[in-house]
Each structure stands twice: as structure tokens, then as C-alpha cells.
């Protein structure tokens, strides 16, 4: 992909810099400002959700500690999950989308800039509403991040209504963000940029946006049904009135399974840009990557009941969902094969983004293998609701989504800030995260297979050693992220000036503009040959 840029197009832009002061951020419609706000917001939520995880791991450091009340422990597990999923991972990827998609497709901005502003500002409101529940008399949500009825309806604390409204706000924000991404990608590509010339990050986000539009209304529906059951006398989820609590699980997981792919597909896209850049050769199998992404997105809609193997669904249903789930391993395997093939015989260097990307490939694959184990319906009776499940989804979410975000941050920080980050500190952040993360989550496979259940504040003595290991690893991983904050601030404030293209093998339009990226870019669209 080569870009020819009209040098004269940038002449008149210098007059239109950002406004000054606080109102610049409150009222901005600039995709770079909004992307920056999403990224900072998601990092703050990452630290908050992480601090909740530290409470969980402190309680589980030894059996019998009782640092916090069991009721509060359950609020921590619930809030940790909700904040990490809806507050950390998803807004981080939306921030990357806002910053990078216009730069990658040669667009002057997002298609719907004012809606962009609104979809961001809904989020602080939503999370203030959610976190405020912790200070209410009956405490915050205590029913797990999957909020199964009747725990979340009949037996819920009074604050559940705030939780429901917070979910509604997040969902509205996600839908608007997704509409914006689709409108931008389908309408604002530079001349010559066909769909099959787009960077894979753009492709994965296009497909993710369709997933969001499809499933966020389902989440809104299920929490609205909860609201009706709690306050308006319906019995959607109450057998006494002719409803069924299992209906909740079906509706929730019909949202929930595509949701986990919403959290990983953008990471697939980012890694598909980063690995070729540091291998100094084009991505292997571009077309198959696009089709694999589409296949994953399609299959994500027909696997939801694998979360429900032990609830009592007909065996023929279990059989279907088992095979459908295993089928997702095929397009995912295509992707892993292509990433490894891209590195094959490349001129590799191991800067921080590449380290995170390689760790992503290896550890995400481990998480995928434990997922295949969980997909086996008869075996799942042993794994279900144990720490093995916790190990599985943290191996896909931490080295998957979170490492994908770290890799992207290090990869694009020079473009955002105009400075190179400190490579030595970046590598240190990587290795501490890598060791801490594996130390925290690998032992969970063992205690899970030995029968330790999830969501408990105390446990049998036989699980003590591995839990202490997990806690030490988790504290190490958590503390390291404060160090990451230091690296980013240091990079913003100074460092070696970044060239327009700081990475040798990087491809794409975003490297044709100066670093830091000007406030307005591609006012005249570039020509893509």
C-alpha cells in the first residue's frame, strides 16, 4: 500500500488547533481528543477494577483470613468483572478505534463526530452510577458479573436498579460507537482504498461493530426484564408466575458470547498490524484473516449454551453447542497459523509492542486450548463453576485483550505523543506483566481441576499453596500497571522525538503523517495505489 500525500493540503490547518481549557475536552468532536479520553477513562477503570481484584486476591491469600466480609467479597467479584469488561477493555478498544481508524483509512474524522462525543460522555455517568452502589445501604451488586436471576432479581440488594440503569447507559454508548465505526469505514475511505486493502484492525472493528449492534439490544432487553420482575410484578424469571430462571441465562448468554468476541477481535486486528511490522514482511494470508474474522463473528451467535451445559438442556442441544463451539477453533487456528507464518523467516526485532504481540499469540492459544476442554459437554460437568473456568477466561482476556491493548499502546504512542517511550522500561513492564500474569492464573487450572469452586471468599486447606502463588502473581501484575502509567506519562512529557514512521516494517496511511499526529489530518484525502 503506498500513499501519495498532497503537501499543500496542510497549509491552512494550523489556525484550527484545539480550544483551550476544560471545555476543549467536554465539547470536542475531534476523533483524536475523543480517542484520548476513551483511553484515559479505560485506564482509570482498569486501575479501579484491578484494585477490586487485589481485594479478591488478598482475601484468598490464605484460608480463613476474613480480611473483608463474605458479602463484600461477592460485591468485589461482581464489580471487578463488570468494570473490567465494560469499563476497561471495551472503552480501550473504542479509544483505539477513534484514534486509528480515520488515520488508517485516510478520513478527516469519524463520520458522526457529535454522536462520538455523546457516546463517550455517557460512560463516566454510567460508571459513577455503578460504583455509587457500593456506598448504598444494602451494598453493591453481589450476584456475579453474569447477574443470574433470581439472585439478581428476587434476592438482589436494593441498588440493583442503579446497576440496571448503568448497563443501559453503557449499552447506548456502545451502540452509538458502533454505528459511528460502521458509518466511518463504509463512507469515508480514501480513494483507492477498497475493503480488501484496509488494515486488519479496521476490518476487525467493522465486524465487531456489527456484533455490538446485534447484541447490545439483547443485553438491554434482559436487564429491562429484570427491572420489570423487580418493580412491576412480571415474572419473566420466576417459576411461580409461569416464568423460568433459565430463560435469563439463554437471553444473557446470547448477548454474552458475542460480547467476548467483541473484546478479542480488535486485539486480533491490532496484532495483525504489529507482527508484520516487526517481522518486516507483509501479513501472511490477509484474505483468509478477513474471512476467519467473519466466520468467528458468525459462529459466536450459535454457541451461547456452552455456558449452560449443567443447567439441564436436552442432550441433542448439548451436542449441537459442543460441536459449534469446537468449530470456532478452526478460524481462530487459521489466525494463529497466519501470525506464526508471518514471523517465519522474517527479520524479527523484539521491541515492546512485538513482545506483547508474541506473548498474545502464545498465551491466547493456551486460553483457547482450555476453552476447547470446556467445550466438551460431558467433561464440563467437572469444570463448570470451578477455578478452571476462571483460569480459562483470564488467559484469553489478560494476555488476549489486555496485552493486545498494551501492544497497541506501545506501537502507536510515538504517533500519539511525538516521543519515543523508554524501551528499557517498556520491556521491564512486559516481563513483569508476563511473569505476574502467568503466576496469577496458571495455578488456577490446577485448583480448578482439583475442585475449587468460583466466587467463594474461603476455601479448603488443600488449595492453600496455589492460591498464595496466585495472589503473589496478581499483586505483582497489579503493581506493574502503575509502572505502565509512569512510562506513558514520561513518554508524553518528553523522550527522543519520534519520526513519522518509527517502526521499520510498519505499513499504512497512519505513518504518512507527522508524529505527533496533527490535530486535523487528511483534510484532502490521500490517494491509495
Please give the residue ranges for each predicted region.
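Membrane-embedded and interfacial regions of multi-pass energy-transducing membrane proteins
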Residues: 2-529
Amino acid at each position: 500500500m503506498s500513499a501519495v500525500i498532497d503537501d499543500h493540503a496542510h497549509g491552512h490547518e494550523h489556525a484550527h488547533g484545539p480550544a483551550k481549557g476544560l471545555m476543549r475536552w467536554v465539547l470536542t468532536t475531534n476523533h483524536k481528543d475523543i480517542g484520548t479520553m476513551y483511553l484515559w477513562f479505560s485506564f482509570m477503570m482498569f486501575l479501579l477494577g484491578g484494585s477490586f481484584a487485589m481485594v479478591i486476591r488478598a482475601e484468598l491469600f490464605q484460608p480463613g483470613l476474613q480480611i473483608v466480609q463474605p458479602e463484600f467479597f461477592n460485591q468485589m467479584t461482581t464489580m471487578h468483572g463488570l468494570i473490567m469488561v465494560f469499563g476497561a477493555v471495551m472503552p480501550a478498544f473504542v479509544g483505539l478505534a477513534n484514534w486509528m481508524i480515520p488515520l488508517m483509512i485516510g478520513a478527516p474524522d469519524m463520520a458522526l463526530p457529535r454522536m462520538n462525543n455523546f457516546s463517550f460522555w455517557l460512560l463516566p455517568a454510567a460508571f459513577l452510577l455503578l460504583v455509587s452502589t457500593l456506598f448504598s445501604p444494602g451494598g453493591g451488586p453481589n450476584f456475579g458479573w453474569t447477574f443470574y436471576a433470581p439472585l439478581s432479581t428476587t434476592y438482589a440488594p436494593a441498588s440493583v436498579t442503579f446497576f440496571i440503569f448503568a448497563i443501559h447507559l453503557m449499552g447506548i454508548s456502545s451502540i452509538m460507537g458502533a454505528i459511528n465505526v460502521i458509518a466511518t469505514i463504509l463512507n469515508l475511505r480514501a480513494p483507492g482504498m477498497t475493503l480488501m486493502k484496509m488494515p486488519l484492525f479496521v476490518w476487525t472493528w467493522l465486524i465487531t461493530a456489527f456484533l455490538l449492534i446485534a447484541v447490545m439490544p439483547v443485553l438491554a432487553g434482559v436487564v429491562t426484564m429484570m427491572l420489570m420482575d423487580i418493580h412491576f410484578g412480571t415474572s419473566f424469571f420466576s417459576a411461580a408466575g409461569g416464568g423460568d430462571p433459565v430463560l435469563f441465562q439463554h437471553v444473557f448468554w446470547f448477548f454474552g458470547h458475542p460480547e467476548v468476541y467483541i473484546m478479542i477481535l480488535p486485539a486480533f486486528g491490532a496484532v495483525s498490524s504489529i507482527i508484520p511490522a516487526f517481522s518486516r514482511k507483509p501479513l501472511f494470508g490477509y484474505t483468509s484473516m478477513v474471512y476467519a474474522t467473519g466466520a468467528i463473528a458468525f459462529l459466536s451467535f450459535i454457541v451461547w449454551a456452552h455456558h449452560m451445559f449443567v443447567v439441564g438442556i436436552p442432550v441433542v442441544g448439548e451436542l449441537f453447542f459442543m460441536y459449534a463451539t469446537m468449530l470456532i477453533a478452526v478460524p481462530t487456528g487459521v489466525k494463529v497459523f497466519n501470525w506464526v507464518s508471518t514471523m517465519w523467516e522474517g527479520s524479527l526485532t523484539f521491541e515492546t509492542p512485538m513482545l506483547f504481540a508474541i506473548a498474545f499469540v502464545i498465551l491466547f492459544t493456551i486460553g483457547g486450548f482450555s476453552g476447547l476442554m470446556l467445550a466438551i459437554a460431558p467433561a464440563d460437568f467437572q469444570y463448570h463453576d470451578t477455578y478452571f473456568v476462571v483460569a480459562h477466561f483470564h488467559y484469553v482476556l489478560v494476555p488476549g485483550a489486555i496485552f493486545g491493548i498494551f501492544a497497541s499502546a506501545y506501537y502507536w504512542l510515538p504517533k500519539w505523543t511525538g516521543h519515543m517511550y523508554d524501551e528499557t522500561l517498556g520491556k521491564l513492564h512486559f516481563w513483569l506483566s508476563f511473569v505476574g500474569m502467568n503466576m496469577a492464573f496458571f495455578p488456577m487450572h490446577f485448583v480448578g481441576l482439583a475442585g475449587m469452586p468460583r466466587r467463594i471468599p474461603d476455601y479448603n486447606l488443600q488449595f492453600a499453596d496455589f492460591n498464595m502463588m496466585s495472589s503473589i502473581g496478581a499483586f505483582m501484575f497489579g503493581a506493574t500497571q502503575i509502572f505502565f502509567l509512569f512510562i506513558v506519562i514520561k513518554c508524553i512529557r518528553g523522550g527522543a522525538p519520534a519520526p513519522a514512521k518509527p517502526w521499520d516494517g510498519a505499513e499504512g496511511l497512519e505513518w504518512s503523517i507527522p508524529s505527533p499526529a496533527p490535530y486535523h489530518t487528511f483534510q484532502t484525502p490521500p490517494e491509495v495505489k
